[in-house]
Amino acid sequence: MFLGLLGALAAHAQINELPRSTPEAEGVPSKAVTALFDSLMALPKTDIHSVVVLRHGKVIGEIYPAPFAPEYRHTMYSCSKTFVGAAVGLAIADNRLLLTDRVGTFFPELLPDSVSANLADMTVRDLLTMTSGITPDWNMRNLTSDWIRTFLAKPVKTPGKKFEYDSISTYMLSAIVQKVTGMTLLDYLKQKLFTPMHITDVAWEISPEGINTGGWGLHIQSESLAKFGLLLLNRGVWEGRQLLPASWVEQMMTRQIGDYGYQMWLCEYPGAIRMDGALGQYVLIIPDKDMVVVITECTLIDGATQRRLVWNRLLPAVTGDQPLIAGKDYKRLQKKQSSYQLPVVQGKASSSLVGKYADKSIMLEPNKFGWQSLELHFKQKEVIMTVTETNGTKYDLLFGYKQWKKASIEGYPPYSIEAKGRFNGIEGP
């Protein structure tokens, strides 16, 4: 295979709506913001996609290392869960739902023939706190299209006792919200939060059952993540309007079991709370500093490393609210913010092995991407990789030599792909 750097992105134009300020105007030294950015960019096995730092509701620093840009949407993985937690609170406020409601009562037609006492006792709160009593089955969604029925058919231990992190529990919450509101989770959030907050750059993956996946699958811009983080920081208030009940935000951000609230995590830094997604997606909410930090990335190291950089490089410099004098450090920050870029993939630009595979169909083993075969077309400045999916869909991915190339993939949510690659080798029969 031709190996290159491949970033999954989705572009949508909606940026720079939050007010901007200098770090010094909000009581933060530019030097500390630069130190955070430099430290994050230097992490091994990590590609930073974006970092946005806010204080007092204003953006005081942001980076989008090339080829990333503010208008790109990012795949949020489990950061999606916190939005589901908010939707549950909204449904409760609308008198459509109770924490004590039994999960099985929403899906009587999907219950097993024999309903155990533990299944009958499982509540909405148990799903919120990851204490459903069902052992997580991370492969279930790849083996069946009947997710709700399969989940309810599994053995259930005593609910409410043991924390077992499970994205399907959050999917069940999405299904419940859809059941009681008559609209998908995404449409409900659009009505209640996204439209008032002018978050229009959002999409959410859909299950075979026609339900937003809930526990994963949200695609959203970094600035919109920052807006949502501010909403939580301000206890549900947005531009003077109470969009999300303050009491519910408090419950979401309060320890319910272990280090978990309602679809959110408590942090190592005292009082800080976070949204947390695979491969290093974070929204850090830091009440004592009146700050929000958004990080999107692809990292293969322990995510606690990134959080420690925020705690140790940035926060110690935030000692008060008095404005500081902006000088050379701010000018340096301005220059660096626009200069960050992801590293170039190393390797050769060509190989004698290319001819063996060029313009030929390469059949693939079954894989999670649903790719059936590839064709590699080597051009002067790029490689065109034609992908054929098992359903017959075809599209091209472009890999540039010493430059980024963009291609789009049709579907929902839509993707843009930017890639830069060099020849590292071909492996095959």
Feature names for model-found ranges:
Residues 134-218:
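Catalytic-site signature segments of enzymes, centered on catalytic residues
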Residues 328-429:
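Peripheral terminal and inter-domain segments
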Residues 38-68, 290-293:
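A short, well-structured edge-of-sheet supersecondary motif
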Residues 57, 74-103, 127, 173-177, ...:
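Active-site SXXK
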Residues 172-176, 216-237, 281-298, 311:
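Active-site-proximal alpha-helical segments within enzyme catalytic domains
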